[in-house]
């Protein structure tokens, strides 16, 4: 799908790409931050020759989820073709940056540099680069095959809290370090033949450069290998990850990491000049992870929160405080030294909501309704908060995990509870006693996802003033789910937001937009000018955001504050039952 703005084109243009799980997007912006062209390649709908579902392949026996790298090559040419057909004059494009699904690794073979450098403009990327990889697949963030390796990582420095303090996160299935450790044990010969290892973000930059790009200063923090305090790879963790192949070999495979997120990596390869008409002076800027790119989609203030409602549910904040905890993530900020990105990420986001949505439609014998969310929204709004028709009723709450979850670390499953806040009594309802299913689950799943965010971010928020309790100043919603005003309303009731809940107008393209803004900043900044200063001066709030729900409401916020206590107990109960702590 492609579209363009009717705005007149003046001055330089910048492209931001978003290589996500299910599609590749390209957004073109001008210096005033206006989107003037966009092109999207949907992997399931538009690709040819790949038996994928929702952008990935799965090996259920080993809990593997992965994507064919060649699919992404096909997608890039198609997105550029789409922009060309719209009439984009690529010679006006001054800079390129991108966003890649975080943690995914790409394994380059011995001929990678030669093949990248020798790209022929008369042929497509897929045809020329399929032989550039030692391994044809990239692990996806939904992969959960690395529990053994995660245990090794968590233990290696003396516990999950020590690993989180050093690298910003405890070990997680999707993180690149545990994935590389498993890869080198499972495929030792392939690992030996691997010349370089890229993250998805640096893979994207490599395609434009015609040689292997360095890893990004923010995205590298999603590996469990980068020591944030030292600003370097952690030698002990490299030793664990490399195993018998050696630390120096792994260092060569990973390469150096520039500290400046806006550094000039080089000019675009002649393939793009000859095939699409790019200027030979077009500059490639480091691509970053999809989550770091999302916080660049607006000049986010430290007192604001973003909730990304995509395939996963993600909570993001920019903060000068580094308060590592095994339940959360800290990354270097993608553009601004001295700031960190705080993140909570859950596998069971949009897919989990869709499962309950479909069950509600099925219960009403509506298999393909014109608006698939209408019944879900109606039922969720009709259900009182926490299913309480009166204050003396127990609070209904649950965990809804169609896939194994990260936080808390649990198998796939569903658990329903009734919680009495007056006594602290928590009772599991094994057969859904007292629940009207699936109707009650519509509100309950939104509440479950938002209560988890409030529980885990409560130590990082502060009072906006007066008698208002600690909470974000604003809650910004991005991603596909940001269009749903029912979710927005309930999010505001739970998370607060003293100034309200807002939708970024191009919310489902936030990653590509953030990448494009990163390119604008990198090439138009004055000496020592921060991203927030440059983008903040050009960002016209009324054009980019819309207030879609009230935030803080005293009574609701206090009721959900009591629910947070029950929610924390519920998680602990399930973890104990499942033998995980």
Curated annotation (Swiss-Prot):
Catalytic activity: D-xylulose + ATP = D-xylulose 5-phosphate + ADP + H(+)
Induction and repression of expression: By D-xylose, L-arabinose or L-arabitol.
Keyword Transferase: yes
Domain of life: Eukaryota
Binding residues for ATP: 373, 480-481, 484
Enzyme Commission identifier(s): 2.7.1.17
One GO-annotated biological process of the protein: xylulose metabolic process
CDD domains: ASKHA_NBD_FGGY_SpXK-like
Predominant subcellular localization, coarse grouping: cytoplasm
A Pfam family this chain is assigned to: FGGY_C
UniProt-annotated binding residues for substrate: 103, 174, 290-291
EC category name: transferase
Gene Ontology CC entries for this record: cytosol
InterPro entries named among the record's database cross-references: ATPase_NBD, D-XK_euk, FGGY_C, FGGY_N
Gene3D superfamilies in UniProt: 3.30.420.40
UniProt entry keywords in alphabetical sequence: ATP-binding, Carbohydrate metabolism, Cytoplasm, Kinase, Nucleotide-binding, Transferase, Xylose metabolism
Family of the protein in this entry: Belongs to the FGGY kinase family.
Name of the molecule in the record: Probable D-xylulose kinase A
Natural source organism: Emericella nidulans (strain FGSC A4 / ATCC 38163 / CBS 112.46 / NRRL 194 / M139) (Aspergillus nidulans)
């Amino acid at each position: 799908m492609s579209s363009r703005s009717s705005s007149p084109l003046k001055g330089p243009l910048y492209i931001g790409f978003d290589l996500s799980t299910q599609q590749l997007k390209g957004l073109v912006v001008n210096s005033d931050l206006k989107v003037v062209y966009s092109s999207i390649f949907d992997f399931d709908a538009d690709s040819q020759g790949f038996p994928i579902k929702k952008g990935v392949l799965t090996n259920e026996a080993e809990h593997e989820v992965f994507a064919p790298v060649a699919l992404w090559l096909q997608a890039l040419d198609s997105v550029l073709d789409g922009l060309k057909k719209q009439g984009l004059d690529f010679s006006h494009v001054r800079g390129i940056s991108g966003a890649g699904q975080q943690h995914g690794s790409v394994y380059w073979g011995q001929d990678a540099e030669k093949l990248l450098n020798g790209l022929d403009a008369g042929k497509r990327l897929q045809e020329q680069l399929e032989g550039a990889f030692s391994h044809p697949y990239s692990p996806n963030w939904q992969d959960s095959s690395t529990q053994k390796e995660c245990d090794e990582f968590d233990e290696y420095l003396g516990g999950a809290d020590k690993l989180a303090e050093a690298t910003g996160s405890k070990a997680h299935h999707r993180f690149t370090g545990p994935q590389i450790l498993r890869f080198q044990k499972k495929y030792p010969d392939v690992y030996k033949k691997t010349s370089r290892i890229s993250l998805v973000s640096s893979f994207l930059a490599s395609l434009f450069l015609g040689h292997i790009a360095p890893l990004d200063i923010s995205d590298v923090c999603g590996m469990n290998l980068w020591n944030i305090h030292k600003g370097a790879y952690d030698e002990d963790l490299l030793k664990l990850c490399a195993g018998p192949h050696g630390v120096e070999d792994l260092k060569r495979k990973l390469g150096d990491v520039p500290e400046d997120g806006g550094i000039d990596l080089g000019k675009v390869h002649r393939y793009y000049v000859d095939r699409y008409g790019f200027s030979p002076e077009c500059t490639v800027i480091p691509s970053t992870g999809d989550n770091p790119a999302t916080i660049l989609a607006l000049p986010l203030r430290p007192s604001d929160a973003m909730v990304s409602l995509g395939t996963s549910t993600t909570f993001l904040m920019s903060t000068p405080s580094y308060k590592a905890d095994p339940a959360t993530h800290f990354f270097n900020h993608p553009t601004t030294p001295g700031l960190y990105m705080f993140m909570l990420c859950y596998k069971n986001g949009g897919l989990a909501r869709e499962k309950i949505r479909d069950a509600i439609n099925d219960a009403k014998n509506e298999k393909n309704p014109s608006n698939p969310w209408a019944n879900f929204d109606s039922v969720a709004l009709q259900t009182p908060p926490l299913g309480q028709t009166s204050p003396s009723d127990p609070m209904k709450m649950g965990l809804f995990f169609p896939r194994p979850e990260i936080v808390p670390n649990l198998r796939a499953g569903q658990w329903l509870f009734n919680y009495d806040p007056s006594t602290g009594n928590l009772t599991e309802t094994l057969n859904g006693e007292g629940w009207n299913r699936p109707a009650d689950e519509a509100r309950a799943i939104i509440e479950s996802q938002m209560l988890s965010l409030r529980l885990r971010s409560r130590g990082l928020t502060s009072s906006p003033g007066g008698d208002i309790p600690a909470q974000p100043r604003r809650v910004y919603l991005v991603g596909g789910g940001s269009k749903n005003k029912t979710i927005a309303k309930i999010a505001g009731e739970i998370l607060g937001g003293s100034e309200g809940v807002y939708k970024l107008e191009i919310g489902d393209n936030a990653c590509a937009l953030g990448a494009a803004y990163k390119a604008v900043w990198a090439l138009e900044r004055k000496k020592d000018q921060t991203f927030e200063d440059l983008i903040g001066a050009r960002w016209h709030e009324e054009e980019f955001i819309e207030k879609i729900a009230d935030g803080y409401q005293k009574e609701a916020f206090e009721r959900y504050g009591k629910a947070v206590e029950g929610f924390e107990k519920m998680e602990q109960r399930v973890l104990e039952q499942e033998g995980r702590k």
